[in-house]
Each structure stands twice: as C-alpha cells, then as structure tokens.
Amino acid sequence: MDATDRGILHHLQEDGRLTNAALAERVHLSPSPTLRRLKRLERDGTIRGYRAILDRRRVGLGLTVFVEVKLTAHSQRRAEEFSAAVAEIDAVVACHIVAGMADMLLEVVVPDLPAYEQLLLETLLELPGVTDVRSNVAIRTVKEAGPLSLGQPT
C-alpha cells in the first residue's frame, strides 16, 4: 500500500459517497487509475463495505452498554461457540476477545434499560460457556468509532 492508496482510504473514510472523479482529484490521479486502485482495495478486503452512520438516539437505540463476559473455559472451541452465538444477536454491535479480567467485551445497543435487562436475562446469560457478566452503562459517548488514522493524505 502506497501513499496514494492511503489517500484514497482517507478520503473515503471522510466521505464514502465521493464520486470517482472527485476522489481522483483529491488524490491527484486521473479517474481510471483511481478506479483501478479502488477496485483492488475492495477486492483485497482493505475496504470491507460502505454504510450510513446513524444517530443511535434518533433511531430509538439510546442505551449503550459495554458488557464484560467471562467464559467457563479458555479454549478455542469455547470462544468460537460463544462468538457464533453472539453474531446472531442484533443488539450486539461489536464483540472482542480481550486479555484481562474478562474474556470477551461486547458493545450492546438497545432502546433502554428494561430492554437491556431482558436481553441480559433471556439471552446473554444463556450463551454457551458464560459464567459471569459485568455491565457498564455508557452515560454519554464522547467519541465513537471514526476514521482510522493512516497518516497524511496525498
């Protein structure tokens, strides 16, 4: 990946709706080589997709909870079973295997506390291998996932 590729990625992270012509202008290439580079970055998985960023509160998902999960066993099989089950839960927007006091860290987005309580009792505590759960309710989000820092754009 060279500086031009990083420039393409930088500008698309800022505005995923840029036309190829506008993107080409920003990275100082003509449209054809810009499009070839873009298609390569998509093909090789560097660009995994494009999506709209929604305001969680405006769509009725005003509560974010970070859930620390401990599993019964520290095995690849157990982590895979848990991960497969979590992937099916729409309210879980992120799941990380972590080092520390917990084995997994989930980011859960739900309408409100009663909805989280229901999810916790009926779903999360029933997942394979779960022995302990600690919930951390976000009071306010200061910074959400944003563009990855790739250095100075071209």
What are these model-predicted stretches?
Residues M1-T154:
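A compositional/biophysical signature of low hydrophobicity enriched in polar/charged and small residues
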